[in-house]
């Protein structure tokens, strides 16, 4: 009986060790993580980062502390929370979310203040095998999708942050056959033939509030987009949350509709 117990115990230890075995992700061609889905692993991804704004999407989560340890406390992490259109220009509203850490398969922009070099992203975390993608729609009906590349992806017809144009996180349209995105990078896609100018705006975590903090539900208000264009007139404050996800201006305050 004791021998049987020991065998079972050793099997359990071996299973635990296997479930947490090292997993190194390719940040060039990409790595299939399907067979690791839901498993706790010691995951590592060596990413080349440029000084300035980069993009990142990982199939595992990292805490704020782990991010600071990997890149330094000056790093910034932002997620897309809204899109605002005026003619051919689309404003990409990014909000600071570093306190939340990196969530698995969430597309982000990341500001790296250090020297251009390869950096190690690592964590003992659950691997998640799912598509990294989010879609927001402008008031003009244009769908803007930000996606993370799990594998090396053809870039023609997509928008991305180029190393030569990353001071302000500008997403540039790629119109040649030689453009591509390496794994763990992010890109933006917009359906149709029309090319847009994408302008990033960065919002601090505490710079944006909710409508409940500035108005009672039955208060009658006007709502403006971040370009100063009125998008709703004489509506109840409680109805603001029915608007498309974005950042709006109400009574001079910035509010976030999720």
Language model feature labels by segment:
Residues 64-85:
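Solvent-exposed beta-hairpin/edge-strand motifs
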Residues 8-18:
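Hydrophobic h-region of N-terminal signal peptides that target proteins for export
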Residues 2-8:
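Sec-dependent signal peptide recognition
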Residues 81-84, 207-258:
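C-terminal outer-membrane/trafficking sorting elements
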Residues 90-94:
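Eukaryotic membrane transport/trafficking proteins
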């Amino acid at each position: 009986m004791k021998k049987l117990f020991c065998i079972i115990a050793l099997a359990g230890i071996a299973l635990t060790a296997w479930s947490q075995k090292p997993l190194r992700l390719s940040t060039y061609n990409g790595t299939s993580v399907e067979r690791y889905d839901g498993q706790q692993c010691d995951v590592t991804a060596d990413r080349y980062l440029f000084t300035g704004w980069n993009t990142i999407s990982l199939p595992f989560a990292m805490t704020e502390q782990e991010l600071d340890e990997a890149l330094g406390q000056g790093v910034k992490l932002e997620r897309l929370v809204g899109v605002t259109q005026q003619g051919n220009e689309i404003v990409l509203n990014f909000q600071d979310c570093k306190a939340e850490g990196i969530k698995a398969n969430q597309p982000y922009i990341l500001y790296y203040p250090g020297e251009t070099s390869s950096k190690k992203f690592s964590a003992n975390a659950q691997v998640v095998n799912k598509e990294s993608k989010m879609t927001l729609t402008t008031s003009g009906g244009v769908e803007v999708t930000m996606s993370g590349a799990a594998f090396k992806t053809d870039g023609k017809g997509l928008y991305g942050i180029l190393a030569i144009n990353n001071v302000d996180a500008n997403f540039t349209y790629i119109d040649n056959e030689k453009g591509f995105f390496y794994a763990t990078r992010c890109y933006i896609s917009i359906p149709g033939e029309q090319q847009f100018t994408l302008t990033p705006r960065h919002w601090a975590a505490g710079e944006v509030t909710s409508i409940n903090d500035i108005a009672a539900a039955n208060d009658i208000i006007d709502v403006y987009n971040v370009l100063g264009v009125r998008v709703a007139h004489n509506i109840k404050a409680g109805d603001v949350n029915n608007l498309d996800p974005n950042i709006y201006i109400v009574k001079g305050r910035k509010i976030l509709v999720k």
